[in-house]
């Protein structure tokens, strides 16, 4: 997870823990939402339709995915089940290689990679990671009443750990 998203979560937790707070603050962590504008499937569909190339940053890049329905369900589930300060995440299974999605979409379009259409490796963008992290190193997963929704629990005494914030910020600066 990127530093800015992590800081946003920590800000929500700090608001939840504020003395005068009367609002219930929670966060959900999404994977990539299939079919949303800007999603890899939408981009690949367009690239295939115009004859390519299909662009992939790196053959080893993996991402977690969820459907629009799963994203909506996660938000609704968190609203009904979540407690203030919660961070909830959907069990999205194993991460998927982006290049495998590209190859599958090419094949499903009746085309052959390398013959009918090419895959072009473009290189990672500044700040882009090979692997997404759904769970921070300082967190453990806890089951909820819903079998596919997990609660993230901070493993340290303080959920707002300035050392981790500093590490996240350093990582963001180095990655850019």
Regions found by a protein language model. Give the residues of each.
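Strand-loop microenvironment adjacent to phosphate/nucleotide-handling motifs in alpha/beta enzyme folds
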Residues: 12-176
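Active-site His/Glu-centered metal-binding helix of metallohydrolases
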Residues: 7
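Catalytic tyrosine of NAD(P)H-dependent dehydrogenase/reductases that use a Tyr as the general acid/base
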Residues: 1
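Active-site helix of classical SDR
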Residues: 4
